[in-house]
Amino acid sequence: MATEKSVTPTEEQLEILEYNFCKVNKHPDPTTLCLIAAETGLSEEQTLKWFKQRLAEWRKSEGLPSECGSVRD
């Protein structure tokens, strides 16, 4: 059973990921995720995992549960 090796993003990759998270979209759609993955050189799975972990960190820093649904009117 093959498992994907955990990869720590480089400083340059982190800059791209953080920029997209903070300035573009905290919830990228599949097309955007694919473009970010291509730009960083990471796999789509690695990129998605990073966004999920980063979103949980952001939610915690904002005093929100790390996982919950969207707030809707």
UniProtKB/Swiss-Prot annotation:
Q: Which CDD domains match?
A: homeodomain (cd00086)
Q: InterPro entries attached here? A: HD, Homeodomain-like_sf, HOPX
This protein's UniProt keywords:
Cytoplasm, Developmental protein, Homeobox, Nucleus, Repressor, Transcription, Transcription regulation
Q: Where does the UniProt annotation locate this protein?
A: Nucleus; Cytoplasm
Q: Principal place where this protein is found?
A: nucleus
Q: Which residues bind DNA?
A: 3-62
PROSITE patterns reported for this sequence: HOMEOBOX_2
A Gene Ontology cellular component where this protein is annotated is: cytoplasm
Domain of life of the native organism: Eukaryota
Q: What are the GO BP annotations of this UniProt entry? A: cell differentiation; chaperone-mediated protein complex assembly; heart development; negative regulation of cell differentiation; negative regulation of transcription by RNA polymerase II; positive regulation of gap junction assembly; positive regulation of skeletal muscle tissue regeneration; positive regulation of striated muscle cell differentiation
Q: Name one GO molecular function term.
A: histone deacetylase regulator activity
Question: What does the protein in this record do?
Answer: Atypical homeodomain protein which does not bind DNA and is required to modulate cardiac growth and development. May act via an interaction with SRF, leading to modulate the expression of SRF-dependent cardiac-specific genes and cardiac development. May act as a co-chaperone for HSPA1A and HSPA1B chaperone proteins and assist in chaperone-mediated protein refolding.
The protein's name is Homeodomain-only protein
- Give the organism, scientific name: Gallus gallus
**Protein encoded by which gene:** HOPX
